[in-house]
Curated annotation (Swiss-Prot):
This is Probable protein phosphatase 2C 4. Belongs to the PP2C family. Disruption phenotype: Plants show abnormal leaves altered in shape and curling. InterPro entries: PP2C, PPM-type-like_dom_sf, PPM-type_phosphatase-like_dom. GO terms for cellular component: nucleus. The lineage of its organism: Eukaryota, Viridiplantae, Streptophyta, Embryophyta, Tracheophyta.
Amino acid sequence: MGNGVTKLSICFTGGGGERLRPKDISVLLPDPLDEGLGHSFCYVRPDPTLISSSKVHSEEDTTTTTFRTISGASVSANTATPLSTSLYDPYGHIDRAAAFESTTSFSSIPLQPIPKSSGPIVLGSGPIERGFLSGPIERGFMSGPLDRVGLFSGPLDKPNSDHHHQFQRSFSHGLALRVGSRKRSLVRILRRAISKTMSRGQNSIVAPIKSVKDSDNWGIRSEKSRNLHNENLTVNSLNFSSEVSLDDDVSLENQNLQWAQGKAGEDRVHVVVSEEHGWLFVGIYDGFNGPDAPDYLLSHLYPVVHRELKGLLWDDSNVESKSQDLERSNGDESCSNQEKDETCERWWRCEWDRESQDLDRRLKEQISRRSGSDRLTNHSEVLEALSQALRKTEEAYLDTADKMLDENPELALMGSCVLVMLMKGEDIYVMNVGDSRAVLGQKSEPDYWLAKIRQDLERINEETMMNDLEGCEGDQSSLVPNLSAFQLTVDHSTNIEEEVERIRNEHPDDVTAVTNERVKGSLKVTRAFGAGFLKQPKWNNALLEMFQIDYVGKSPYINCLPSLYHHRLGSKDRFLILSSDGLYQYFTNEEAVSEVELFITLQPEGDPAQHLVQELLFRAAKKAGMDFHELLEIPQGERRRYHDDVSIVVISLEGRMWKSCV
């Protein structure tokens, strides 16, 4: 939605054992892949039985996280434009409409179309046409542990002491900061991976930093490091905005967060995995008329949500308990040889048994505290907290924009749709403003009519499907779609008659309140973040006359009141599709669910979100009478006539998304 985008800057600290000096550290990256089209990324939670001593996942028994796998992909259709509030361009030019950044627990790679000369390529286990090279999940399965875009939760290489300032991260082109020998034995690599996971002691958070220094290239800069209980607490930041501030909530810094965020045109995606609280946060912000509103949401909404959920899904006592456990574990790790001998001696004195009993007691207390917290969770209050977080974020945005109205009146035009999903254990909380959607893939009820539909589909597709699936062994009936689509969100657009009636009832004196299926002939959505020119007359009057609307009265034409929904996961729930509205330009809810279901059956090692993006582009090209590559050769901006910016996140809800039909 819209036609603009912003700059991307990367600021974070080193991960070494020493406190960093307050100076910038720049690393030039060699020949990255073209990132202008979009990205595919994934997050696969490690199996706690394989890495049982990992500090990150040691609380698996006391923190329930239902999801197992996250697959995401974004593609841009709009050109790259700078923020209207930027005083200068720190990179000298804006040349990327898409960018991605994350901690090392995420793997990502730019979308790379298959060369024309390669000819038609079909996936090994099914008749699915390919347009892009392998995504990060498929590469991980194909390449094994030597591939840096694999499925490990952290970097394979243990940082060298000479490079302690370099905090290794999952760059989108898949290259490490330090090029080392890749001719290592498998045992050595696994040993390093396990050692790295066991010794990982740094916590990382994503937070916006206000100041940005000049640089001609993509670089790495140290920003801030704190020493907490003899450990470095690393604060990492990715700036899409030049006018943001660092949230100083100490409790947020004490978390162990894995995060990813990216842009595609004017879409923004934010994924935060909180190992500390056992929740997953996903935000998709579909901007329009400029990049400032979605950038502001990307930088500010999650910290406000976190603060509003205090006392509901987390509290200070948990943070304090974690800090004490952290301090205690550090003392254990730094014990001397004499202390180790004393430990062995205590074993013979049966003191070990008493310590084991004490450990069991503490674990039971933690489990009991968690269970009690779950029973006391008021879902209505959680949803209200999400709503309050959005309200406070928009108020802060409009207040800031109001102070800049004389210099940047175009801020009155900029807005964004909002889709937020918060998963805590088996509870899903969804908040949306606009027309982005959350669609749940559920196992259908085995009733007569559904069985009849399956029979019809099986008969219709028999000739076309069976010929293509000769190489796929096993039960062919599993290929027949058997999942239904359940939309958790409510569309706020002029396509919904209730929304149109609401606006007309609020403006009885304005016959042009909804014209040409748009609010005041301007906006398709009926609710949005920002877009002040449709909310207050003063914002409309600040615009150039050619952009002004005929504002009648003082009541707002659109609002930012979200739709809220709570869903308790059950045995029938399989996966959740979160997406901006660009996906549903070519898919219905049912088609999207069926496409993902069929794909993960035929291609268990593939990337479902990337597949949806790919299929969307195939459909857009076919509708326009061109092939896949011809569509992608159209410059961004002009390509917006054929498809919108699209951001998709597919979350597995059954513990393991990938199951083979073989």
